[in-house]
Amino acid sequence: MIVSHPDDEALFGGAELLTHSDEYKVVVIDEYHNEVRRKEFISSMKFIGIEEYEHWTGYKGGEDYHREKLIYELLRVLREREYTKIVTHNRKGEYGHPRHRALHDILNHLRPDILWQFDKGRKRISNKILIKKRDLLKVYESQKEVLDWFSPWYEKLMKVNK
């Protein structure tokens, strides 16, 4: 799973990670060197039980990622092993976020064959997973006001290119 901000993995893919933690490496591409967010991300990984993760910082905001540097680093990760699924933001950036859209476009260019995206599900996630996901989101104390805007009840992954 490759996302644009610490908390995106929990917000948009928390149920997936909580039920399939052994299948994922999580990479966060962050524009800031924010120690609080870094610690929250590490706490999120520990809460979920993810052993493989990377938090990259210093990437310019907006749609203007330093694309050459980012593509180089993404290719390094993608070549580590034979991945069968890459999960990231959807083409619309969930709520229109330019960094989410840009990351989707880059990954769709690099590995369209195995790309999956976050989508809103119509089926509510189970109460057992919902309780865990809510507890997971509490790890991101610095983002509480932002996270309150989103509904944690529905979550779905969708293959990008069928």
Residue ranges, per PLM feature:
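Active-site beta-strand->loop->alpha-helix modules in alpha/beta enzyme cores, enriched
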Residues: 1-112
